[in-house]
Amino acid sequence: MADTDCKWDPGADKYPLLGFGQAVIGPPGSGKSTYVRAMQALLAQMGRKSAIINLDPAGEDEPGAAVSLRELLGLEEVMSELRLGPNGALLYCMEYLQENLDWLRGRLQGLRGTYFLLDCPGQVELYTHHPALPDVLRRLGAWGLRLCAVHLVDSHYCTDPAKFISVLCTSLSTMLHVELPHINVLSKMDLIEQYGRLAFNLDYYTEVMDLSYLVEQLTSDPFFRRHKRLHEKLAEVIQDYGLVTFMPLSIKDEKSLRLVLSAVDKASGFCFGETKQSLGNLMSVAVGADFQFTSYPSHDCRG
């Protein structure tokens, strides 16, 4: 495991804003790394400097990543030395990062002002109930990194009512646990027709409309018919909170990627400018003033 001596400049703390960025989260296979690379390419096209921060100790080093957790420790190393399985080793890596966060802080200080793309691990419990990663993200926020969580979910779950209800529960739990501005994304929309026919229009899934219709779709299966009451209660919880909606995304469609970036920029506050400007801008919005995003050309969130 690497030396964790802190190399950040304490004097730099007089500048409170480290930068803006996205914490890209979601289950395995949802397309996080592909999204990160596509988003970096889009940002470069728009003239916005960005850096990929690979926080997944399990994957191979992200091509072009400015910082990789594997510089500090790798999953295989932890599994070998501590005789842990893959899941236990990944949790250990996150806890190790949590305890040695000055290492990451020092690396990010050298990239101050860059737009950060945090490529996070795919283990679901890291976002739903384990404390390490949410604590890391909160502490980065306290150090001046304004993050928005981008939660990717494979759109194939829309083709199965039971799986979609499960995804809704996971998304809600993640939003409540991570406690960041949050954008849920249905990824791989270009493949959705290959997954099977949807029971409802796409808007039904993205806007999470009346879930009672989805529960009714489960009654054709004897197993789910026996647990209909459970699914009804889960649907009630999701709709009572009223927090979960999705944005559709196809990496092959630049327009959909720009729409996600625009939503992220608004959620994180990037559109409202740097620290000295942002309070006034936010207050203008709060009192109903006519705010023009074009006031800050370098922070144009319209794409």
UniProtKB/Swiss-Prot annotation:
Q: By its UniProt entry, which Pfam families does this protein fall under?
A: ATP_bind_1 (PF03029)
Site features described as Stabilizes the phosphate intermediate, chain residue numbers: N87
User: Residue ranges for motif Gly-Pro-Asn (GPN)-loop?
Assistant: 85-87
Where does the chain bind GTP?
G29, S30, G31, K32, S33, T34, S187, K188, M189, D190
NAD found in the keyword field: no
Q: Kindly give the InterPro entries that the UniProt entry links to this protein.
A: Gpn, Gpn2, P-loop_NTPase
Q: What PANTHER family is this protein classified in? A: GPN-LOOP GTPASE 2, XPA-BINDING PROTEIN 1-RELATED
Q: How does it assemble?
A: Heterodimers with gpn1 or gpn3. Binds to RNA polymerase II (RNAPII).
UniProt similarity note: Belongs to the GPN-loop GTPase family.
| Protein's name in the database | GPN-loop GTPase 2
